[in-house]
A protein has these predicted regions:
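Alpha-helical coupling/stalk and coiled-coil linker elements that connect catalytic or binding modules
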Residues: 2-432, 440-441, 451-469
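Switch/coupling sub-region of P-loop NTPases
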Residues: 469-503
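GG-anchored amphipathic helix commonly corresponding to the ABC/SMC/Rad50 NBD signature/C-loop
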Residues: 441-458, 488-502
Length: 503
């Protein structure tokens, strides 16, 4: 078992005065404030998590916090993973906490990961061929997901059938089309019905060949309309108008106008919902097309990598589900006010409901969000490789760790003094306060972790015999708790020793 601790890890004295403290300020990724942001990539499994548990080792919270892997004490500075991955969208940003969970001693996996990174040039070219250039809109997708999956009033809001016994009719475009037409036509019917009642007496009298006079017409009209507001209004208005009759007349007219208002409001809501559904489905269609292309490019280049078999199998499975969604959404076009779009309302509602209710599609979409974040992270690593900010490591089970010209990640855009480290014996580092002792230790620990996750780090070269345990003794807070600082330091040392002994 190999174990490395932040307290004693160096083989020779390094000049700590040559290390500069980071002063960079991160470029913030814009996040929409209109819609609550959900972490859609939280349960995504990185390729490293497909390895056998015996080859996986967790990064403790102490180590993560001390090395500032995810968060920093200064909110204006980037975390260490941000310097490595350079996330450009929210999916990539939200996936970063998943990286800090594990590192591995599986050298075959690390070499396969290096091959994946080396294939990124071809991956990027394949993705951009045929002018395929989709700009992913994470905020829009988050908004769509909230509406599809987090809306408790989904069925009632979009006028779907809510009765469980016949809820399956929501998957019938024909039935949904009929319901939509009826809902859209109801305001017109309510408005036209009074005028039709005015015409019907003429038709009846003409059919019965009865001479048409105004008195006869009114009698027939009152008989026909006795259950409608017109008949009631005529019956009320033809007599003497008392106060109670006037109030009653106003009431029934007001009720009729309210009915028209409600119908028009419902019709307007349906129209706006149709525009929204069409917009959401078209966005999902474009995203799914992009995601399928993304997965196919990765599989084409990396399906033969042995340590990536499990990951590639999952990609293939979810890609098949996305193709089914793509087939369903192929008919969806940008919204335009036309008769053709009116006849498509049932189909749009069917597609929308299918995505809302299909559990397999939900899992595949969530996988695609995580996969997008993963590929964006890899592109950030590859960009660092192209710029020669980082280099690949070599692995040797017979020797000690030897890192040449390593430096602290936050100094990547500066001109740092680089240092060599050879871990064949313990050493003691000494320097004045703020001389860079902690920076050297953190640089070494970070590069070991990065190398055992991705096979590369912030150095010119590295030969590494993978470590199984990584401990940190960098930051022991002096709090007002029951432990003194000395007791807290002793307790941390005891925890590290116990872990080593148990292993």
């Amino acid at each position: 078992m190999l174990s490395v601790s932040c307290v004693n890890i160096f083989s020779k004295i390094i000049n700590p005065d040559s290390i500069k403290e980071p002063t960079d300020t991160p470029k913030e990724i814009p996040i929409s404030t209109d819609t609550p942001t959900i972490n859609l990539v939280q349960n995504f499994k990185l390729p490293i998590q497909y390895l056998d548990n015996s080859q996986l080792f967790s990064i403790t919270d102490n180590v993560s916090n001390d090395l500032e892997l995810i968060t920093t004490e200064n909110e204006k500075q980037k975390s260490m993973y941000h310097h490595l991955f350079k996330p450009t969208n929210n999916f990539a940003e939200n996936l970063i906490p998943e990286w800090k969970k594990y590192y591995t001693t599986n050298i075959d996996y690390l070499n396969d990961t290096k091959n994946v990174l080396e294939n990124m040039t071809e991956y990027r070219n394949n993705l951009l061929q045929d002018n395929f250039n989709y700009n992913i809109k994470c905020e829009k997708i988050n908004e769509i997901w909230n509406e599809l999956k987090m809306n408790d009033d989904f069925l009632s809001k979009y006028n779907y059938i809510e009765w469980d016994m016949i809820k399956h009719f929501n998957k019938s475009s024909d039935i949904l089309q009929v319901i939509s037409i009826m809902n859209l036509a109801s305001p017109m019917i309510s408005f036209v019905m009074p005028f039709m009642l005015l015409i019907i007496p003429f038709v009846i009298l003409k059919f019965q060949k009865i001479p048409i006079t105004f008195t006869v017409y009114l009698d027939v009209l009152k008989e026909i309309g006795k259950n409608h507001f017109i008949g009631k209004a005529l019956a009320t208005g033809m007599g003497s108008l008392t106060a109670d009759k006037v109030i009653y007349l106003i009431f029934i007219i007001g009720f009729y106008l309210l009915q028209i208002y409600q119908n028009v409001t419902m019709c307007s809501r349906m129209y706006n919902n149709t525009i929204k559904i069409n917009d959401y489905l078209f966005e999902m269609r474009e995203y799914i097309e992009y995601s399928i292309k993304n997965m196919e490019c990765f599989l084409k280049l990396n399906k033969e990598l042995k340590c990536y078999n499990g990951f590639c199998n999952d990609i293939s499975k979810h890609c098949d589900e996305l193709r089914k969604m793509q087939l369903l959404l192929n008919r969806v076009k940008p919204f335009e006010l036309s008769f053709e779009k009116l006849l498509d309302m049932g189909y749009l509602l069917k597609c929308y409901y299918e995505i809302h209710s299909n559990v397999d599609w939900e899992q595949s979409l969530k996988f695609s969000f995580g996969f997008e974040g993963y590929m964006n992270n890899l592109l950030g690593v590859f960009e660092n490789l192209e710029c020669k900010n980082i280099s690949y490591a070599n692995f040797d089970l017979s020797g000690n760790c030897h890192i040449e010209k390593q430096y602290y990640p936050p100094l990547v855009d500066e001109n740092p003094v680089k240092n060599d480290c050879k871990f064949d014996k313990n050493i003691i580092i000494s320097s004045p306060n703020a001389g860079g002792k902690t920076t050297i230790i953190k640089s070494s620990m970070l590069n070991i972790i990065f190398s055992q996750q991705l096979g590369c780090g912030f150095y010119k070269s590295c030969v590494l015999n993978p470590y199984t345990h990584i401990h940190s003794y960098l930051n022991i807070p002096d709090t007002s708790g029951r432990d003194s600082l000395f007791q807290a330091e002793s307790r941390r040392c005891k925890e590290i020793i116990d872990i080593i002994n148990e292993s």
